Amino acid sequence: PSIQSCAQKWYAGRKGLATGVIGGAVGLSGAFLTLFVRAALRGFGPVQGIRGAFWALGALTLPVCLAGSAVLSDPPQQKQRKSGKNGIDLSPGQMLRTKQYWLCAGAVCFSTPAVLLFSPIILKLGMERGLDETAALWSIVLGSVGSAAGRMLMPMLSDHIGRRATDLGLFAASLGLSTAFWAARGWWVVVCYAGLTFCYSALAAVLPALSTDLFGLPHAGVNYGFLALGQSVGSLAFPFAANLLALENGRHLLAIAGAAAGFAAIWALHPVRKDPR
């Protein structure tokens, strides 16, 4: 959240682009980590097994993060004031008292089942529906590619057509893909799953810009953190419900219902008044 809120302050006129580049890097990391960990489990050079993978990732991450944090800073206050077009500046406490917060957090929560109910079982699901193990692995790789593309492209599109229109389109696509995924077999499992990861990651990537559109830039990091709690709730509640109720095909029903509920939440979303009470 801190990196994305900082980027939005520097590029207030292109917030979607700024957060999309960051989100694209996050999405690509999924493909890298999948291949890296599988290679580490087979062993290469000094990297042997899962412990070796963690040591290697730590050695790569530490200098990169330290260097990045050394140069990361907010723009001058004068530039921030010129960039504040909507005049909204809600503290976290004020934001929590608006219905817009609960609609946004609810939409984020309802975006999760389409992917998170299936990501732990996608290899098993693919093989049950006619793919061999090698082909089923492509669902993970192409899912990561879809995630990176969604995180990069859709926030940029939202700069032009608006966050609400973008999210409505993504939830509608997620609803259609979730329905198709229920009956998909063979390579259509991979296609549908990659499309769902595109939509899910795109919805997550548009959220930081949507947050600052609604609630302002000054408290962007904390406000975004509160909105992201919806994702945490969804990522725990929906899998728990599916496991508790021993749902198999029911997972697809939860995903379809979640996409429909998310669409309804965004449809009901409108800008915050400048003097919320």
Regions found by a protein language model. Give the residues of each.
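Intracellular juxtamembrane helix-capping segments at the cytosolic ends
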Residues: 1-11, 18, 202-215
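A late C-terminal transmembrane helix in Major Facilitator Superfamily
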Residues: 21, 30-31, 214-247
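Helix-to-loop junctions at the C-terminal end of transmembrane segments
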Residues: 151-162, 246
